[in-house]
Amino acid sequence: MKSLTLIGLAFGASLALSTAALAQDIPVAVAGPMTGGESAFGRQMKNGAEQAVDDINAAGGVLGKKLSLQVGDDACDPKQARSVAEKFASAKIPFVAGHYCSSSSIPASEAYAEGNVLQITPASTNPLFTERKLWNVARVCGRDDQQGGVAGQYIAKNYKGKNIAILNDKTTYGKGLADETKKALNKAGVTEKMFESYNKGDKDFAAIVSRMKRDNIDLVYVGGYHQESGLLVRQMRDQGLKTVLMAGDALADKEFATITGAAGEGTLFTFGPDPRNKPTAKAIVEKFKAKNIDPEGYTLYTYAALQVWSKAAAKAGTTDPKKVMDTIKAGEWDTVIGKLGFDAKGDIKVIDYVVYKWDAKGNYAEINPKGS
């Protein structure tokens, strides 16, 4: 790629954009947790964006110009995300693929809207991101009311008559997903025995594990991220609990297995059908493998976000964010994760969550793989 710039952690860090590069290239950005507890997903996003920019540039770029990629680190912190967004907006970057955490994407989107920046998130699933109907937002992933619905139905079908617990980490993503799962579960006629919260960043779950043990919990659904979920499942096993842990898409990184070790076997989570298995992704997956990168989780979703924007800009004949967004919503776009169309709010029109299971070797696979 032509250039790669990282926006650091400090709020006062300057946006290191080369004037010469800007004169020749079109600056685009990826923003997410490049540091902090969710940095594994930031790496996924950065890998996906870098490969997409390389491939777009190799094919001639956009409107006759190469793309230059900027990287913003929000550490999944809302204030830091807003700061990153303001810097990108002041630099007149027309497009950002980001962010990862919903608690980052939502405040960042307001700064992008004010600064005339188009934002497509590969990963933020909280419904509020698009329900506010900002002109500048879209996502290439599903929503928690859809993901929670699949999880709730799965639990109701497979754990009927069992003792269920629901936990959440109080974050925008975690609490929202837990609430949607509870809603679907209750609608199916199942009432959870335990509903509790913890704080993101907690490491000691002894009190929660003790209550689960006392209440004979068969399955615990966690609305939260992979670090805390991994520690929880380890502590459950240490206390002799065979309780199954189920969570959402935040478990779609092999760092979860690094945290859990053998204790993670049998853990369930929801995510879209594995894009690595799609025929549309075969050539791109091979490129990643040649670099010794596993394009898991949101890697290919980030790649797809860049594809949608670049194709729409080419069709619109401009990088003007509002004109490109109008073009995005008016069309359908062939991407590495399949054909995508968007509704008026910026949500994709076809959603298809499935359930995955972690195995003893630290790998995950769809329980009922669809492969396309």
PLM region spans:
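Extracytosolic ligand-binding ectodomains
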Residues: 1-11, 23-372
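Sec/Tat signal peptide C-region and signal peptidase I cleavage site
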Residues: 17-23
